[in-house]
Amino acid sequence: MTSKLEQLKQYTTVVADTGDFDAIARLKPVDATTNPSLLLKAAALPRYAEHLRQATAGSGGDAGLACDRFAVAVGKDILGVIPGRISTEVDARLSFDSEATLARAHRLIELYDEQGIDRERVLIKIASTWEGIRAAEILEREGIQTNLTLLFSFAQAVACADAGVFLISPFVGRIYDWYKKSENRDYAGAEDPGVQSVSRIYRYYKANGYKTVVMGASFRNLGQIEQLAGCDRLTISPDLLQQLADAQGELPRLLLPGEGEPRQVLDESAFRWQMNEDAMATEKLAEGIRLFARDQEKLEYQLATRH
């Protein structure tokens, strides 16, 4: 029998959630995603020492530019061993500034262009704030495709689809974490709140003819992945990808298009109200932005203090 990983690939595009080049080369995903936390881990790997040196040398003391140059260098390496796309993230500290997000996205695309990488192989990752979604809407009109991340609520998914973004990354595991702690109980299978969130979004998109790709992210266990077999894409850590590669047994498609809610359009006040009413999404979005910003600052410090 084929492994669960090979079976999953029959229904779902498998994406590696890592900046570890060697893991990607071994596990052969179609696409890869990075973020400031993963880049900080990658910076500790010996294979990236030269990229760190070059990123610093070419940035004129601008630590933010050095981070972007390092992210693009890692992305270029990864694109050499995958057939698809790399997702590279905008500085999370710009999450509430549409204009600054646009400027940083344009810079990332220019840096990839300097490396001979076509924009068709790059997704710009942006936090799913109201301001981030508005920036993504403009980028999509410019032909720059986006990946809206830190997505925890149905309201965020509705706004992203209405804006015509290329892809969203709803966070399964972090939703699960919040409910497990808040309700003081564990969840498994179809009862998992993170699984339920992605399933609801997926069916809403399919029922209403949205082209936006749903890519489940942030998994805590194989059960969550198995429940979402059939989702457009799943971005999975190397550890869980390896567990899938080693696992035998049936892996049926459990997520299928079905009845979805009627099409909605949210203006800014309705979006903010629905977010305000969702304690989990409000807390996890704020926490996610803080964590990515902190790791961005750590990476900038590391680059600024290199000798």
Swiss-Prot record:
<dbReference type="GO" id="GO:0006098">
    <property type="term" value="P:pentose-phosphate shunt"/>
</dbReference>
<keyword id="KW-0963">Cytoplasm</keyword>
<dbReference type="GO" id="GO:0004801">
    <property type="term" value="F:transaldolase activity"/>
</dbReference>
<comment type="subunit">
    <text>Homodimer.</text>
</comment>
<dbReference type="InterPro" id="IPR004730">
    <property type="entry name" value="Transaldolase_1"/>
</dbReference>
<dbReference type="Pfam" id="PF00923">
    <property type="entry name" value="TAL_FSA"/>
</dbReference>
<protein>
    <recommendedName>
        <fullName>Transaldolase</fullName>
        <ecNumber>2.2.1.2</ecNumber>
    </recommendedName>
</protein>
<dbReference type="GO" id="GO:0005975">
    <property type="term" value="P:carbohydrate metabolic process"/>
</dbReference>
<comment type="similarity">
    <text>Belongs to the transaldolase family. Type 1 subfamily.</text>
</comment>
<dbReference type="InterPro" id="IPR013785">
    <property type="entry name" value="Aldolase_TIM"/>
</dbReference>
<comment type="pathway">
    <text>Carbohydrate degradation; pentose phosphate pathway; D-glyceraldehyde 3-phosphate and beta-D-fructose 6-phosphate from D-ribose 5-phosphate and D-xylulose 5-phosphate (non-oxidative stage): step 2/3.</text>
</comment>
<keyword id="KW-0570">Pentose shunt</keyword>
<keyword id="KW-0808">Transferase</keyword>
<keyword id="KW-0704">Schiff base</keyword>
<comment type="function">
    <text>Transaldolase is important for the balance of metabolites in the pentose-phosphate pathway.</text>
</comment>
<feature type="active site" description="Schiff-base intermediate with substrate">
    <location>
        <position position="125"/>
    </location>
</feature>
<dbReference type="InterPro" id="IPR001585">
    <property type="entry name" value="TAL/FSA"/>
</dbReference>
<dbReference type="InterPro" id="IPR018225">
    <property type="entry name" value="Transaldolase_AS"/>
</dbReference>
<dbReference type="GO" id="GO:0005829">
    <property type="term" value="C:cytosol"/>
</dbReference>
